[in-house]
Amino acid sequence: CIYVEALMNRTPWRLWNFWKGIPNPKGSALEAMTILENAFEVFPSAWKHAGLLHMYIHLMEMSPHPEKALKHGDILTDLVPDAGHLVHMATHIDVLCGDYHNVLSRNLLAARVDDKFKSYAGAENFYALYRIHNLHFAMYGAMFLGQKGAALEAVSRLRKEVPDEVVHLY
């Protein structure tokens, strides 16, 4: 898992040439994909490894075939139920494949998990950006579903997470 993450970090957020649908020639997307897909094929326990599932989702989300990671996201959503970020991760693929119901429901679930962490650790820490990210995804999914109430609720919660100084600055 750490080796694959290192390969992916050679060209962070540029693993694929999105417009051409090919791997970035300066990166290691194909090598990372081969390693991860081999792990899932050869080692059944890989399907219970949150790190491997997480890396595969990030690897495939800007690839020409994000749908290859749908199963990985479905499994990861329930694997670590007290980690809001991992509950949310499947929606990086769901949104690309048009599954807005899962985008909304999984991010609302992630937001509930995030609330538990916020109660424990407070609001002002590195995880604040993850809470905002999950609520933004929930709002996006709700809008694509035409669920005005859910979208407004998500944006209301989102606004409470973003300090006034940030809102006024941007």
Name each model feature, range by range.
Residues V103-F117:
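Acidic, glycine-rich loop-and-beta core segments that form the ion-binding/anion-interacting portion
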Residues L109, E153-R157:
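Beta-sheet-rich non-transmembrane sensory/scaffold domains
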Residues F137, M143-A151:
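A conserved active-site cap/scaffold subdomain adjacent to cofactor or substrate pockets
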Residues K48-A50:
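Active-site-adjacent "gating/activation" loops or surface patches in catalytic cores
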Residues A29, H65-P66, Y100, K148:
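TPR-repeat structural position
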Residues I2-P44, L53-S63, H72-I75, V80-D82, ...:
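Short coil/linker segments at helix-helix boundaries
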